[in-house]
């Protein structure tokens, strides 16, 4: 087998700022407003290279409202659109849109490594339970709060498809 015949794909577990300092040089004055200066990562969390390409279909939810003692299923069709066989790490992120305390914009809650032959498609399924939505509040109680959530599935933290559901 040649080098290009063997499929290799690795994901990075962190992201790199586009500029190594995270902020531009202050010309003609001193600047310490790092938080106000927009920077995009050069490589987002979960980014990886591949010898092939993949396409994600839209997310379908079996319901858009989930009770505290229930669950819901999120599905997406993944297609290998390239000319080579390959593996893809399908990543699940969840965002709590309104919470008692500040929550991450995207929180990795699951992933699946899927191998597809060139041209092959497969339905990828994630089961969402209230346990995936829990966090420690200010009183150190492990809780899932009712409200709206964004569910994101994609190839890395920036290239995702989004669906919304409500926990009640």
Walk through the language-model features, giving the residues of each.
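Short acidic, flexible loop segments centered on an aromatic residue
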Residues: 83-100, 106-108
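Terminal connector regions
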Residues: 129-168
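Intrinsically disordered, low-complexity Pro/Gly/Ser/Thr-rich segments with frequent PxxP/GP/PP motifs
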Residues: 100-136
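Extracellular/lumenal ectodomain signal focusing on beta-strand-rich modules
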Residues: 53, 58, 110-113, 132, ...
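Intrinsic-disorder/low-complexity, polar/charged segments enriched in Ser/Thr/Lys/Arg/Asp/Glu/Gln
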Residues: 71-73, 121-125, 160-162
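Secreted, periplasmic, or luminal enzymes acting at the cell surface/secretory milieu
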Residues: 1, 5-87, 93, 150-154, ...
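Surface-exposed loops/turns
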Residues: 68, 118, 145-146
